[in-house]
């Protein structure tokens, strides 16, 4: 899984291969690669 960091809250998110960047594993907030 590609580990990235969310720009807003600074938490980590993962790219589960579904074309979505998920923050906190909730897949509700789009993360930006930092």
Curated annotation (Swiss-Prot):
Q: What is known of its domains?
A: The presence of a 'disulfide through disulfide knot' structurally defines this protein as a knottin. The cysteine framework is VI/VII (C-C-CC-C-C).
Q: Which residues form the propeptide?
A: 1-4
Residues with Pyrrolidone carboxylic acid modification: 5
Entry keyword set:
Cleavage on pair of basic residues, Disulfide bond, Ion channel impairing toxin, Knottin, Neurotoxin, Pyrrolidone carboxylic acid, Secreted, Toxin, Voltage-gated sodium channel impairing toxin
- Going by the entry's taxonomy, the superkingdom of the source organism is recorded as Eukaryota
Q: Give the family, as the similarity comment puts it.
A: Belongs to the conotoxin O1 superfamily.
Q: Which organism is it from?
A: Conus ateralbus
Q: Which GO terms describe its molecular function?
A: sodium channel regulator activity; toxin activity
Expression sites by tissue? Expressed by the venom duct.
Disulfide cross-links: 6-23, 13-27, 22-31
Record lineage: Eukaryota, Metazoa, Spiralia, Lophotrochozoa, Mollusca
Please state what the protein is called: Delta-conotoxin AtVIA
**Cellular component per GO, a single term:** extracellular region
- Annotated function: Probable toxin from a worm-hunter cone snail. Shows an excitatory activity on a majority of mouse lumbar dorsal root ganglion (DRG) neurons. Very probably inhibits the inactivation of voltage-gated sodium channels (Nav).
Q: What is the effect of changing residue 34 to S?
A: In AtVIA[I25L;V28L;T30S]; no change in activity on mouse lumbar dorsal root ganglion neurons
Q: Where, per UniProt, does this protein localize?
A: Secreted
